[in-house]
Design a protein with these regions (language model features):
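Domain-level signal for Mg2+-assisted phosphodiester chemistry and nucleotide/NA-binding surfaces
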Residues: 1-92
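Extended two-metal-dependent nuclease catalytic cores across DNA- and RNA-processing enzymes
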Residues: 28-30, 56-57, 80-253
């Protein structure tokens, strides 16, 4: 068993915690960082995670986002408010982590997507991330508090819920006035289907294209969503993501 680590989060937090400011007066303030402290912060957090799985002595794989993001081609506004530069030492920490850890960065993908692809290509590993988006990926998820097992059906449902609820942090709005709780209530009443999603968007004066855009932005990639030969994402379509209804309300509209 391997631990698939969302290292973006860990390294960003570690480097930000090692920053300090020097106010030179007048109009000059500089930001400085102690590299050894940033590395110590990272190693501390990785050790804490590994300690949670000591009985299995797992290997760790650290996943980082690429500097380019395919979602920005779909929607230029995606994460548009996240323009702050990375904290001091961020790139150097990643470079040094490669010495002792396996590090994975996939072209144009976020760390979430790379973890989703790896986890579905190699079942039996555990994703480590506090990001609720990872509830889309079937398998084990450790959110830094608890470990849960997510089924493929639960993952598909969570993607639908996020499509309606949106994510203001990531810059896609979903359906105005609908959050996670209201989305769950709506799906439980109307069924987990693409038609339910489209109707919710249309009821607010939006279109099916708006629904599809939100679904594609919300989707965390799995192996089925990735062209390994061309090394590029396969954009999500409703037909590809629905499942056979087994009494839980997830409906197949592909026929």
């Amino acid at each position: 068993m391997k631990l698939l680590i969302d290292a973006d989060y860990i390294v960003y937090k570690a480097c930000a915690g090692a920053e300090d400011e020097i106010d030179w007066g007048d109009d000059v303030i500089t930001v400085v960082s102690k590299f050894s402290e940033a590395m110590k912060n990272v190693e501390r957090d990785l050790t804490r995670i590994k300690t949670e799985f000591m009985w299995d002595t797992p290997d760790m794989i650290l996943f980082f986002s690429d500097s380019k993001n395919f979602r920005k081609k779909i929607s230029p506004d995606y994460k548009g408010h996240r323009n702050r530069k990375k904290p001091c030492g961020y790139k150097r920490v990643i470079r040094d982590l490669r010495i002792n850890y396996e590090v994975i960065v996939m072209k144009t993908l976020e760390a979430d997507d790379a973890m989703g692809i790896y986890a579905t290509a190699h079942p039996g590993n555990t994703i480590v991330s506090p990001d609720k988006d990872m509830r889309q990926i079937p398998g084990k998820l450790y959110n830094l508090t608890d470990t849960t097992t997510i089924t493929a059906e639960e993952g598909a449902k969570w993607h639908m819920i996020q499509t309606l609820a949106g994510d203001q942090t990531d810059g896609y709005s979903g359906v105005p006035g609908i959050g996670v709780k209201r989305a769950e209530t709506l799906f439980n009443k109307e069924g987990y289907s693409w038609s339910t999603i489209v109707k919710a968007f249309e009821d607010k004066g939006l279109t099916e294209n708006d629904a599809l855009l939100n679904a594609r932005l919300a989707r965390i990639l799995t192996l089925d969503d990735y062209d390994t030969k061309r090394q590029e994402p396969i954009l999500w379509t409703p037909k590809a993501a629905v499942a056979t209804d087994d009494g839980t309300g997830l409906q197949d509209e592909s026929n």
